[in-house]
Structures are given as C-alpha cells and as structure tokens.
C-alpha cells in the first residue's frame, strides 16, 4: 500500500482586506452602540432589535478580521492546523448569545402589546436613519475593490447587506409612530427584525457546531464523491474510510482507495489528487492506496450502502 499527503500552499491575506474589515467593524460596532443608547432613550424596541442585528454584523466582521490575522501565524507542533478553529469557537459562543438576546427582545415585545409604552418617534427616526447609513457605508467599504476569492470579505459584506432590512424596519416603525401615533408598530417591527436575527443566528449555530464536531461540509455528498472517483479513474475499484472536515475555510480529507496495482504509484496518486482538487476543491488530502479489498469491521463505518462502490 502507499500513502500520499498533499496540500496547496496557503497565501497570506492581503493587508487591504484586513484594513477594510477593521474600518467596517469600527463603523458597525460604533453605530450598534449608538442604536442601543438611542433605543433606551427613545423607548424603541425596534431600535434595540436592530442593534442586536448589527451585533451579528460586528461579530461577523470581527471573526473575518481574526481569520485574516491568525491565518498569518504558521502552524506549530501543538497546533498543526494553525489557529483557524478559534473563529469557529467564537462563532458558536456568539450564536448562542444572539439566540438568548433575541428571545429576550421578543418576550419584551409581547409584553409591550399588553402594556404599551411611549416611544419618541423623532429620536427613533434619527437613530434608525443613522444606522441605515452606517450599514450602507460598511457595505461600501467591504465591496469596493474587494477580492472576489476572499470568502471572509464576501461573507461579511453579505451579512452587512442583510442588516439593511433591519434598519429599514426601524425606520418604517418610526414613520408609523410619527404619522399615526400607533406605538404597537414598534414591537411588531422589532419581532420581524428578531426573526431575521434568529434565522441568521440559527444558521451560524448549525454551521459552527458542524465544524466543531468535524462534520463534513453540507455541500459535499461523500457517497457521490466515491462513485465519481471510481467512475473517473478506472484503476480505483473501491473507496472507503472517507473522512472530510473543515479547518477554517479549507476542507481536509483522508481516504482509503482499493486500486488495481499500478505500474506507476506516484502517477496514480497524482491523478487522484488532481481529481479531488479540480472536482471538489480539496487541496489537502491524505490518500492510502490498497491492493486488497477491505475486510475489517470498520470498512463502511462512515458510509451508507449506496456509497459502497465496487467494480468487477
């Protein structure tokens, strides 16, 4: 049998990415604090709910910035994959905090239906418009001259763009209160914004838990990959012991491949590596080639019967 371990060289993030993320984080975090103060002073729950949404933006920007900074640190003997998993842990903690905060806001909104409180619509409007402008500015900072291949910056920009809807919700609530004096618009809009935050937080929680538990990327069908590999490379008779997990943004894979004894081991290994790289963008793979069928009790430990591929 033969082993092969390959990985593509990681390129250091550009400094301009870190600067843009830092500027966007400062703007977003600053206006988040302004919305908290404005929400307390005006009595607007919609502003507080939108501040919670901006908290998700600030956290996403901070995590992206941490990835840029920590990815510059080389792996060590104790941390062989570097420090990328730290951002996943922070995302997990942040997601739990967001769920708790959002549920508290929803509870407060329900209470306000029964015990309405006065809302300063004009102050609420000023703060909400400022928050909207902050989101637009942060999105512009991230989008201008952005590196389309930088997933961190792209994800952060999309996250900020999603928060624009929350700011619009607070503005709509303020307009209704100013024009009609109907204060229930505030808790109604705060609940709608909270639903958006919960949706984002729940997705973040699921993704972070999946990565912390070293789950396979949800976009990758391991059984389909096994069939595809055996179909594209005839020398591969069976693929088993397939494990895929994420380290930061990069997928890592190990697999066993039962192959017809090749004349050139290195050439076959290179073909398998090229297949994984070009078809599935997996640049970091450890491949064990075997000449005999796997007969151990754990041969199909991590695959369904449909994933068992055997060519006669």
From Swiss-Prot:
GO terms for molecular function: zinc ion transmembrane transporter activity. Keywords: Cell inner membrane, Cell membrane, Ion transport, Membrane, Transmembrane, Transmembrane helix, Transport, Zinc, Zinc transport. The chain crosses the membrane at residues 21-41, 48-68, 90-110, 123-143, 164-184. It is found in: Cell inner membrane. Pfam families: Cation_efflux (PF01545). One of its GO terms (cellular component) is plasma membrane. InterPro entries: Cation_efflux (IPR002524), Cation_efflux_CTD_sf (IPR036837), Cation_efflux_TMD_sf (IPR027469), CDF/SLC30A (IPR050681), Zn_transptr_ZitB (IPR023500). Signal peptide: none annotated. It is a multi-pass membrane protein. Belongs to the cation diffusion facilitator (CDF) transporter (TC 2.A.4) family. SLC30A subfamily. Involved in zinc efflux across the cytoplasmic membrane, thus reducing zinc accumulation in the cytoplasm and rendering bacteria more resistant to zinc. It may contribute to zinc homeostasis at low concentrations of zinc. This is Zinc transporter ZitB. The gene is zitB.
């Amino acid at each position: 049998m033969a082993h092969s371990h390959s990985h593509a060289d990681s390129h250091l993030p550009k400094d301009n990415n870190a600067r843009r993320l830092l500027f966007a984080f400062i703007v977003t975090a600053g206006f988040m604090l302004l919305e908290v103060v404005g929400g307390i002073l005006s009595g607007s729950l919609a502003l507080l709910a939108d501040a919670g949404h901006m908290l998700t933006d600030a956290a996403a920007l901070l995590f992206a910035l941490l990835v840029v900074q920590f990815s510059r640190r080389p792996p060590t003997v104790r941390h062989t994959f570097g420090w990328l998993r730290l951002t996943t842990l922070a995302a997990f903690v942040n997601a739990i905090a967001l769920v708790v905060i959002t549920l508290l806001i929803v509870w407060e909104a329900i209470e306000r239906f029964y015990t309405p409180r006065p809302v300063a619509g004009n102050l609420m409007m000023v703060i909400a418009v400022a928050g909207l402008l902050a989101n637009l500015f942060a999105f512009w900072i991230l989008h201008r001259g952005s590196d389309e291949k930088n997933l961190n910056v792209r994800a952060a920009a999309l996250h900020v763009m999603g928060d624009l809807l929350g700011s619009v919700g607070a503005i709509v609530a303020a307009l209704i209160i100013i024009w009609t004096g109907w204060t229930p618009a505030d808790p109604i809009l705060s609940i709608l914004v909270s639903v958006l935050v919960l949706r984002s937080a729940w997705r973040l929680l699921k993704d972070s838990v999946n990565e912390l538990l070293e789950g396979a990327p949800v976009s990758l069908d391991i059984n389909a990959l096994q069939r595809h590999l055996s179909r594209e490379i005839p020398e591969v008779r069976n693929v088993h012991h397939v494990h895929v997990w994420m380290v930061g943004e990069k997928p890592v894979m190990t697999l066993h491949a039962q192959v017809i004894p090749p004349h050139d081991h290195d050439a076959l290994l290179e073909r398998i590596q090229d297949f994984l790289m070009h078809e599935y963008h997996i640049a970091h793979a450890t491949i064990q080639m075997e000449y005999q069928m796997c007969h151990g009790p754990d041969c199909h430990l991590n695959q369904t019967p449909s994933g068992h591929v055997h060519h006669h």
